[in-house]
Each structure stands twice: as C-alpha cells, then as structure tokens.
Amino acid sequence: MGGNSTFAAGKVAAYRWKTVGKIDGVKVLELKDQGLSRKLPEEAHSSRMYIQQHPDGTFSQLRIYDHFHRLRFEVGFHREPRLDRSGSPVLHYHVYTYTSGSSHFERTEARRVTERMRKKLGKFMKGV
C-alpha cells in the first residue's frame, strides 16, 4: 500500500500503509509504523477510495480519488476549530482541486458533511 509520496530520492517510496480489512469492498488502511503522519495517501494506485479507522474501529477518515489516482475528496472526523471551537470532533469534508498539468493541489476550508453525503457515505463511517 502506497506511501504518502510516490518517489523519495529518485526511488519509489516504501509502502507506509497496509490493508487491514474492507467495508463494502473499500479497503481499510492502517499505518505500518504508527509513529508516521496519520493522513491517508495523497495518491491511490489500487483503489478509488480508502478508509482509515481509529484503533477502536470507529471512523477517522476517508479519501476518494479520481481516475488519475489523485485525491479529490476527503471526509474526516476529528477536531476542526473553524467549525467547532469546543475541541470536540466534527464530521467535515474538504474538496481538492488541481492546476492543469500539475500535481499541486488546493484544498477547500473544512465544511460540515451534508445529510446527502451522510446517506451516501454513512456505511463507511462506523461509530459517527
């Protein structure tokens, strides 16, 4: 399972993630080294969507990728101070856009997940 970047020092980066299960056919990933960055990969080479869960099995994050394997959409459940100043986790999303011909992306500010999104993606959000 891919690293968070494709190349390092001119070589393919070592895999940082392992598949630990599936939910409705979508891979649930876990870091091989728990000390590394907890963000799911920015690129996907074997799936169009990945899920990450907390150690207790509750939902943490999901990312959806386009046909070029680039990150396009992310849903997360963690603190997001711009949406909730209490410090409590909040279910929110970001949309990613790319400059034509570039691998550079822009991410929108966090927005609360809509009811429509919850209906479509809720089966992946255990415990939220």
What are these regions (language model features)?
Residues 2, 6-128:
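Catalytic toxin/effector domains delivered as secreted proteins or via bacterial secretion systems
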